[in-house]
Amino acid sequence: VPLHKENDYTVKELVDSAFIQSANASMVALAEKVAGSESKFLELMKKQLKDWGIKDATIVNASGLNNSYLGENRPENTGETDENQLSAKDVAIVARYLILDYPEVLKITSTTNQTFGENTQSPVEMVNWNWMLPGFVNYHEGVDGLKTGTTDFAGACFVGTINKDGRRIITVVLNADNHEENPSARFNETSRLMDYCYDNWSEKELGKANASIPSLKDIKVKDGKETSVNVALKSPVKVWVENGMDTGKLTITPTLDKKKVTDDQVTAPINKGTTVGSATIQLADDKLGYLEANQEPSTDIITTSTVEKANIFVIGWRHVTDFFSNLF
């Protein structure tokens, strides 16, 4: 998609062209609009990746092209043949945050064709490079994104996403084999991945509301009529489970809220249903884990009863007995 200096383009037009037809010039224009220069935009990119826990990515330009194509226009302090490098895991993390934080992007990535610069003297008809969308040769029902990418170094790549029966998955295919002879290779592999996930995995609930936690039955209560209060899970969690996996064997890991629980105790009065922490719930047999630790499914830990504050005489007597017990 060419940019003409005599034309004005909106930010939306540039964003649309970048997603729909991999418009490299549009990406550079957006970088300059956001940060003042492409080099400054790279610093924002690196900071964002770091905030997402991605620490080993190589970022040298905004477009994703090899620097050899950019010539003198490559960002300063980057090599003549440098290229962005991210692992499949890194790409999946970026895609996940993009969809979670900006779900409206799927309206763009699911667009099959659109006119760029429609109100200018040089409009261009764009056609989406994602052949898994409706009307294309590799159409797969439910696919609504996300982005293709191709360089000599990275090969033919595709980050796909599909929503089926309310369950969304993200797939990453890098350097698809036999792409030169079969341009559909990356989409064929993506289709296989998607079918495998839905055929072999399903979403299920783990844990139960008000279920006890094996490693944390109760919490001490300071100055209460009772000296402890039982705690439990507030609700079950939904997780993807591989078919045939034992959902009865769970690993529940509690974490108490330090603002409410001091020295492993809460202070009376405390009401039933008060949140005192959170607990992650995992299948004991699940060895795959998650892309990020903060993705582990969790639920609140709540108190199962109300504990009123004890009267002043009871509190005073407890302090006296505690004092003498500490002496011996």
PLM region descriptions:
Residues 1-28, 126-145:
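Conserved catalytic neighborhood of penicillin-recognizing serine enzymes
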Residues 5-7, 32-34, 63, 173-175, ...:
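A mature extracytoplasmic/lumenal domain signature
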